[in-house]
Amino acid sequence: MMKIMKKAFAMFVAVFTLLATLCMVPVSAAGTVVAQLYGRIEDNGQAIYKMVLDYGNVKVSGVDKDTYTVHAKTSTEGKRPADETAYGDKDQDRTIVRVEEKGTKVEIYFDENDGAAGTLSYLATGARNIPVDIEYTVTQNTPVKVSAMDGTDLGEDT
């Protein structure tokens, strides 16, 4: 009887350990960060006013306006005749006016009058707007502090 109890207990511990291991969330600094753009409708069309960076399962702190550089490239190439001029194709850095830490996310707010916020380009021929292809590149200039959800310090994420 004792042998059966020992085997049952060993099986119970093995199953419990396996389940506990499967339920653990791995915590590590983010290698890739998910970014999402947000726009709103203004008098002259839609403007991108903020970007949210999601660091996944780590909290982020120690960020400010100088932590990131955001470059915007908007283009109508391939959507219009090559000899037609488009007013709205841009290739420039966005002006960051504010950065907010919100747990695992960082919200970056842009100056909507910096010339690169628009999602449309004006074509002189036909006097019309067409949507632009948008490409944003985010460069992290300085390390950010990262911590686990329970507050455990994970150091800096470069």
Indicate residue ranges for each PLM-predicted region.
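Short, exposed beta-strand/loop patches in secreted or surface proteins that constitute
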Residues: 35, 42-44, 95-101, 136
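N-terminal non-catalytic regions of secreted/periplasmic and cell-surface proteins
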Residues: 29-66, 158
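Short, surface-exposed alpha-helix to beta-strand junction/turn motifs within ectodomains of secreted
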Residues: 52, 56-98
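Sec-dependent N-terminal signal peptides
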Residues: 6-18
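Sec-dependent signal peptide cleavage junction
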Residues: 19-31
